[in-house]
């Protein structure tokens, strides 16, 4: 008997347990859907913070008998609770908007393997049984596909914790007829991807979209001899490296995307920010209603007067109504030098009385105002144990 045989036997047992865990997680999600249906009838909020905290406390107590530490149980069940909350939110939204689509065509930046492609898959997995992929070369093409009916939804990045706002997308939001109907966040884990055996010092040219280069500039500064070559998406960079099949070429992108192109990870990169997260927006031709049982966001686009304090006056309206603003972004108005538009994300349902009152006041003091959309907030703040 070789020394590896006991290890293989143990791994087989672990694999069998993993399959049992998957089956149990599927059963738990099915029960979460039943809970969502019950809340739909009783009109109770999706989130019950007291129940979530009591659940964590009970599981931590039970875990001690199995020698499982509190941190491990907390992290594991926070993720399970998040999935339950988002699953119930999707259920309530489908019922309210009478949408139960079997499939949808989603437009995103880049071919398969781009971060936008991964975000589109994430959104589709929770909302549709199937989704038809429609990769685009430019952000403008994504908007055009949905505006003209070639696609049902657009998934576009709007901001990143490391490189900041995606200005091209903000500019397109100024003029589009589309409405924001959803959001999601994707953790970005960049890797140096190569086609075969090589090392970091052998690489001469690195391909990627401008965003990964910005987000990983500290890492890249260690290799000043690398030539930086910009591509329209991370997946386009991967395609180039796969086709070149050279030890001197590499791409910056995700491990999952690299696998789709037959690339392997040479190095996992530490981005400039410890948490490198990109927020994506989902847009459609028709605005949606958001259940008052679900935490909501409303995104506005306003233009204020040129007089001193005009923006402050607008923001005071939100404060006076106890509305929480989670994002404020300014962009120039094309054709009007030195004038700016302001994008505001507000934690409120568009149809709520307080939001309607605030909109009325804002309409009286701003030069223009546009509601870009009201949509369910995907930021499920984890509950900590007592």
Task: Give the residues covered by each predicted segment.
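Domain-level signature for soluble enzymes in the chorismate/prephenate branch of the shikimate pathway
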Residues: 1-386
